[in-house]
Amino acid sequence: VVLPVKSFSRAKSRLAAGLGPWRQELAHAFFLDTLWAVRNTEGVRTVVVVTADPLAASQARTLGALVCPDAPDPDLNDAVRLGAAKCRSVGPEGPVAALTADLPGLRPRELEHVLRAARNHDRAFVADHTGEGTTVLTALTTSGLAPAFGPDSAHRHTSLGAFPIDMPSDCGIRLDVDTPEDLARVALRGVGPYTAALFRLRKARFPAAANPVEGFQDVQSAQGVQSASATASS
């Protein structure tokens, strides 16, 4: 699995108007929750984090991922291609998936379902909750990924031959966060431990602040949620 990650200082600019500097901390927590879910998905052999952010790189290694250095101001599709090349260099050719790193409500069982369904298609994708963007892109080989992330990427991936995998619009794998409205939507459904801890730390008034998604509660102390969130806010 390839997970491209922007530098936290540059990420989630559309959240800045409503949330100010908190957006940087949120981007950090989103990444950690997404990575945790990916690492705990059955069938995922290798995770490659593509990033120029030193904190993201350090924490990715701590959580068992490989790290591929990225350009300081990366293009998302270039980052995905870099990650796919890294996958080819460290293991046998095989299925690959690229995910956006802003899925704080992602559940391992959702990703497992998608990866299982993707085995039946040369290329496949999951649209975001709007039906316009893409949160997951898969291919049976690393060289076949052909990413086209960006505006209207769901249409572009379809036009390039990728099969759309149908998932409920309110499941975590489709709930990427770009706007305050997106944040409220995923918070109502439930977020992972890092984002939940940040909500508590910031006393954010979201229902998920005291109610992380099912399956995440048991890992909070083991993964050092509080210290990770404190690092994000420092």
Model-derived features: positions:
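Short, glycine-/small-residue-rich phosphate/pyrophosphate-handling segment
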Residues: 135-162
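N-terminal nucleotide-binding beta1-loop-alpha1 segment
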Residues: 1-15
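Acidic donor-binding segment of Leloir-type glycosyltransferases
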Residues: 44-66
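A short, N-terminal amphipathic alpha-helix
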Residues: 27-44
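The conserved acidic donor/metal-binding loop of glycosyltransferases
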Residues: 100-104
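Short phosphate-binding loop-to-helix
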Residues: 61-95, 153
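Conserved donor-nucleotide/metal-binding helix-loop-beta segment in metal-dependent transferases, i.e.
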Residues: 106-131
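Conserved alpha/beta core of the MobA/IspD/sugar-nucleotide pyrophosphorylase nucleotidyltransferase superfamily
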Residues: 152-218, 228-234
